[in-house]
Design a protein with these regions (language model features):
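Glycine-rich "HGGG/HGxG" loop immediately N-terminal to the catalytic nucleophile
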Residues: 117-125
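Short, surface-exposed "cap/lid" segments of acyl-processing enzymes
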Residues: 44-105
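Alpha/beta-hydrolase active-site loop
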Residues: 99, 126-147
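Primarily recognizes the serine-hydrolase "nucleophile elbow" in alpha/beta-hydrolase
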Residues: 141-183
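Short beta-to-alpha linker loops that shape the active-site pocket of alpha/beta-hydrolase fold enzymes
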Residues: 76, 114-118
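Loop/turn elements at helix/coil->beta-strand transitions in domains of secreted/extracellular proteins
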Residues: 66-69, 106-111, 152-154, 179-183
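Serine-hydrolase catalytic-loop signature spanning alpha/beta hydrolases and amidase-signature enzymes
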Residues: 77-79, 110, 142
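Catalytic-loop region of hydrolases
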Residues: 1-63
Length: 183
């Protein structure tokens, strides 16, 4: 079920990557992790303002200082709005994100975007590289605005299936679209 969390506010900031809201994820969490849902601004595949959603997964015992980011791009989960990983109970587990427990143990923060149009209203950029990549990079920007989550600019991009496609495009456009991030 898509709840009100995924609805865009009446006034959406023009700046892409702005954190609009966050709350606790109600699905399964990794044994040593804390999971939050985020809603943020992004730019769709056609360059128009859009809203995206996703998950931010951190260690329940974080190491001090800014932490590097693993930007996880999910594989195909369906093309409907209700197919967003952040709407599913097991999207923040080691079965959904390979090596998640090890990544958290090493102190990395995982940002896992749904891509715009999944969870949120709008066109879903299925295998449209620009849209997937912008949504992914903007999820990292939004996660950096979470309280008590200190993200370093160092970002490793990772994905499987559709997420592999998104990861390649994210790496391709990162320098121009999000120059503050070290992808």
């Amino acid at each position: 079920m898509i709840d009100a969390f995924y609805s865009a506010p009446a006034d959406v900031p023009a700046r892409h990557g702005a954190l609009l809201r966050f709350d606790d994820y109600e699905g399964d969490a990794p044994p040593a992790g804390v999971v939050q849902r985020i809603l943020y601004t992004t730019t769709d595949a056609d360059g128009r303002p859009a809203v995206g959603s996703g998950l931010v997964i951190t260690s329940s015992d974080p190491l001090p200082g800014p932490r590097p980011v693993v930007l996880w791009n999910h594989g195909t989960t369906g093309v409907a709005r209700g197919c967003a990983p952040s709407l599913r109970d097991n999207s923040a587990t080691r079965w959904a994100i390979p090596a998640l427990d090890e990544v958290l143990k090493r102190g990395w923060i995982v940002v896992a975007p749904d891509y715009s149009g999944q969870g949120t209203a709008g066109a879903f950029p299925y295998l449209i590289g620009q849209g997937e990549a912008r949504s992914a990079l903007d999820a990292v920007r939004a996660a950096a605005e979470l309280p008590q989550r200190w993200l370093a600019p160092d970002v490793v991009v990772w994905g499987h299936s559709q997420g592999g496609h998104a990861a390649l495009w994210t790496s391709k456009i990162a320098r121009a679209y999000a120059p503050e991030l070290h992808v």
